[in-house]
């Protein structure tokens, strides 16, 4: 069976990770590997922590698309990869990596997943999760305060100076590359069921 790569894109806080994980759970008993694009932020060891904090993490230049494309290619060939682990406190990659084994289905999510042509073409099914801006902002605030220990003022400043402008410039336009657009994120169970059915049909077809 040729591995099937499912790409799930959408703005920060859109619910794309929830959608991606629900898809991954629903396609069992096929083996599934899950990858988050955030792991592929560039490793700016040459910068100070303060300089790294000021970087625009929502611009395509923030990501190591070369490495991501190579590793997706390896997974598509049935090989395991060593995925980077990104530390959002130090804004650096950890020395350790995470082994992602070969799998029947590879699900990857990320805000700019469809911006890079090489990565986009690696995805056999492209899903864009479309959620209102106010909902995305609230979710981002909750996530960054709880999981990443960031102060509210810093989160809002980043949203206004980079997250929102980059969403309009890069994320939203990438929606045109999607095969399927999911409104309302992880709450849209009908859309997720339809996506899952499509994936299962393709898996069955590739295995026949």
Predicted regions and their residues:
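ATP-dependent NMP and nucleoside kinases share a basic, alpha-helical "lid"
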Residues: 94-148
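Post-Walker A helix-loop "phosphate-sensing" segment adjacent to the P-loop in P-loop NTPases
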Residues: 25-33
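Conserved lysine of the Walker
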Residues: 16
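Hydrophobic positions on the alpha1 helix immediately C-terminal to the Walker A/P-loop
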Residues: 19
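Conserved nucleotide-sensing/catalytic segment adjacent to the nucleotide-binding pocket
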Residues: 33-35, 42-90
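Phosphate-binding/switch loop-helix module in NTP-utilizing enzymes
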Residues: 71-108, 200, 206
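P-loop (Walker A) phosphate-binding loop of NTP-binding proteins
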Residues: 11
